[in-house]
């Protein structure tokens, strides 16, 4: 074995050990262990013996062809499974150490914020400001605190000059930022993106990823 190859192997080994050390220092947030799910209307599982652990601070991309189970994993994480989409599960699935399959949609929304592929499917308010404030209104946050929080989050995603606009007046990139603000407003633990760049041009996509 050449000296260069030995160095490469040592570097790889050290990087793996460092990653394992960092994992031990952080807490797992999402844990799938031998997890399987089969929709009621299907004859075989969409997810079969999935093992996946995501730790605090990690950014994970799930990639695969159509029908490979990407959306099913997302539905498990945001609570649509088993609350909306029914089926049979086996194995364990935890969020922040708790059995995630026992959470209702409201409980799950306290931990997970979802940004959909098509922002138009997610808008609720008549204006950008109302849409960002929607979750705070449901939590009965005092009005002044709500106004300050909406302004702060809108500045973070660079839509603070559009708070009085209708969401449907915005460009694709601006719409995506508004939906992101709507989930950031509650200081949630997990951000879940369902193909957030699918409808964006390269420049808008890069800006969204930076946020």
Please report, for each region that a protein language model flagged, where it lies by residue.
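A short, flexible loop at the N-terminus of ABC-type nucleotide-binding domains that lies
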Residues: 23-32, 37-49, 81-86, 102-104
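Conserved ABC ATPase "signature" region
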Residues: 144-162
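Hydrophobic anchor residue at the start of the ABC signature
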Residues: 180
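Conserved ABC ATPase signature
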Residues: 166-170, 174
């Amino acid at each position: 074995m050449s000296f260069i190859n030995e160095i490469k192997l040592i570097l790889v080994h050290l990087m793996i050990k460092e990653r394992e050390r960092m994992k031990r220092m952080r807490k797992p947030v999402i844990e799938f262990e031998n997890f399987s799910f089969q929709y009621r209307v299907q004859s075989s599982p969409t997810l079969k013996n999935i093992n996946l652990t995501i730790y605090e601070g990690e950014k994970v991309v799930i990639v695969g062809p159509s029908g490979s189970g990407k959306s099913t994993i997302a539905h498990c994480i945001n609570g649509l499974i088993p609350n909306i989409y029914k089926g049979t599960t086996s194995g364990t699935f935890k969020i922040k150490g708790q059995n995630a399959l026992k959470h209702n949609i409201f409980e799950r929304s306290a931990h997970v914020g979802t940004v959909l592929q098509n922002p138009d499917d997610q808008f609720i308010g008549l204006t950008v400001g109302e849409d960002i404030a929607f979750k705070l209104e449901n939590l009965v946050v005092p009005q002044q605190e709500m106004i300050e929080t909406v302004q702060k989050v809108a500045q973070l995603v660079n839509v603070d000059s559009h708070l009085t606009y209708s969401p449907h007046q915005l460009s694709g990139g601006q719409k995506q930022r508004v939906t992101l603000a709507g989930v950031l407003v509650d200081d949630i633990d997990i951000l879940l993106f369902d193909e957030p760049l699918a409808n964006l041009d390269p420049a808008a996509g890069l800006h969204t990823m930076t946020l």
